[in-house]
Amino acid sequence: MKKLVFVPVFLLALLVRQAHAQMYVKAIRANDTVPIKGAIPVKYEGKVEECYEYKDAAGLHLFLATSTSAGKYFLGTCYTLVNGNYVQDWQIKDYSSLEVAMADDYTKIVDIDGDGIYETIIIYEYPTEGNKYGGTTWKLLLHYKNQKYAIRAHQKDSDYDEEDLTMDKTFDTLPKSLKKYVMQYWNKLAKDQNAMEMFDLKK
């Protein structure tokens, strides 16, 4: 008969605190207006928009956002260090015939639910195509437990146009704390852009 091993609550709490104490996020490039701090340890093409090194309970990671062809192609890629080499975990791709630009200083690498694993939030924009009135398309992408969740909005430039806001139905499957955090963060963007009528997500 196997013996049960009981871990004291205080020891378990200590181990959790130690794991969280080892977590960090370091900006190699916070946005495209500041210099790159140090070498980027993966191959890439185009311009580095943002780059972060971060460590959590799953290991050491790198998030790299790049744009190519005058900003028309956008890639957001996450890597994890495995046996001394960075291996791609996931990637976000987007394209505009004009330009795709990240919203400066809005990238979030944060442990929202406190499980020791970082979630990633990125926000970017590009000119709305196929709309005779123009305008801007905004996207927020959350990466959580190997799945992507998106909020999309069309910001109008003309009084003859209509604004539009859509949220992936999969957001309803998120834990309430995560969904609330992301909605509040999106609303912060709305406030910063003076576009509350379009962006304001109801709690």
Per-region residue spans from a language model:
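Sec-dependent N-terminal signal peptides
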Residues: 4-15
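Acidic, small-residue rich beta-repeat scaffolds with periodic aromatic anchors
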Residues: 16, 21-48, 136-138, 143-203
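N-terminal "first-domain core" detector
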Residues: 30-90
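Acidic/hydrophobic-patterned starts of short beta strands in beta-sheet-rich repeat architectures
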Residues: 58-65, 113-124
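Short consensus segments that form the blades of beta-propeller domains
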Residues: 63-71, 97-99, 128-135, 140
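Short, surface-exposed coil-to-beta transition loops
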Residues: 73-74, 105, 121, 134-138
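Short N-terminal edge-element motif at the start of the domain
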Residues: 75-114
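A short, structured loop/turn motif at beta-sheet edges
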Residues: 108-118, 143-149
